[in-house]
Amino acid sequence: MSGIKRTASSNRWMLEHFDDHYVKLAQKMGLRSRAAFKLEEIQQKDQLIRPGMTVVDLGAAPGGWSQVAVKLAGDRGKVIACDILPMDPIVGVDFLQGDFREDKVLQALLTRVGDAKVDVVLSDMAPNMSGSDSVDQPRAMYLVELALDMCHQVLAPNGCFAVKVFQGEGFDEYMKAVKAVFKVVKTRKPDSSRARSREVYLVATGYKL
């Protein structure tokens, strides 16, 4: 390991992470990640999840969003989560580990959803970042396209969709695609999202197809 040097950007990320107010608060509150606060802020503004709803959480690990979703959906609700990474169990969450880009994983996820329609699709998916926009942005846009396709397959009429998108090439076209199938689409930048990050969240309500 002595021959491996950390880059300035990775060192900066480590310093930011461990000095981050939301990281410390998440640890104090027993939340799995600081990302939980992003969904909580979106929920406060847009009221996406209500008791009894069925929610699909894509890119769920380590479980911050699933923790929030299962609390909001309550005992009568259902949360189905998926991630390529492992996730420790959460009471009330049906977790599938697998690569959402693979058809066999999609089919397994659809099997868990069953015949009932889903009320909310959440996606906090992001690719492993290489540091090259020309590589990272297409990968990120591919994931959000898959998340929108999931909406087309499982979302109930008037259902909701919240998805992390990185601003850059393909963003405007994706926004148009989301607006074409939802009645209202808002762009959110939660306070808990790092200011220098290009990530925003599209919050779409009133699914039309």
UniProtKB/Swiss-Prot annotation:
GO MF annotation terms: rRNA (uridine-2'-O-)-methyltransferase activity
Subcellular location: Cytoplasm
Active site positions, chain numbering: K164
Highest taxon in the source lineage: Bacteria
Keyword S-adenosyl-L-methionine: yes
Keyword Methyltransferase: yes
HAMAP family the UniProt entry points to: RNA_methyltr_E (MF_01547)
Family (UniProt): Belongs to the class I-like SAM-binding methyltransferase superfamily. RNA methyltransferase RlmE family.
Cited PANTHER family: RIBOSOMAL RNA METHYLTRANSFERASE, RRNA METHYLTRANSFERASE 2, MITOCHONDRIAL
Protein's name according to its UniProt entry: Ribosomal RNA large subunit methyltransferase E
Highest classification ranks of the organism: Bacteria, Pseudomonadati, Pseudomonadota, Gammaproteobacteria, Alteromonadales
